[in-house]
């Protein structure tokens, strides 16, 4: 098994040159964060909205790079098994910080909220849970953008964390957890 720091993960052009798939720029950036992170596209040929998102994606890379490079990786759910979503997280060695990536590959009508049981956290630590990158199409739940919760590690690992509702296919969100 290779560490995440050895995995090339880049934001590619869209539609993808290999499979022709159309995936939101945000999702491509969120997924690329759990690897070496980079861009494989001509920025002069992408929409201005995507160009405007690049500084934020690079800032997120710098913010989470040490965590991704040195943390422990946990695969929480696989699209290959559930045919709906992927979910994985990286937890720092001292268990004081984690980054969860949730990707809704395919949306389902009238689908109830998903509770994802997290892994690798300190059971007795209280974590500040921050849903990042929220917008009108990728909201952080019924309480609005940038909802913050305080939950214990044992609660997050045994009861789980409710994933935000998202409209459409190939949507993603990052959830940052910081021990208080």
Where are these regions (language model features)?
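Glycan-recognition surfaces
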Residues: 1-44
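Flexible loop/turn segments at secondary-structure boundaries
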Residues: 14-19, 40-42, 48-49, 107-110, ...
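Catalytic cores of secreted or luminal carbohydrate-active enzymes
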Residues: 26-78
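A generic secondary-structure signal marking the coil-to-beta-strand transition
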Residues: 30, 96-98, 171-173
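Conserved, mostly hydrophobic/aromatic
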Residues: 32, 100, 129
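Carbohydrate-binding surface patches
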Residues: 80-123
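C-terminal beta-sandwich/jelly-roll accessory domains of carbohydrate-active enzymes
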Residues: 107-180
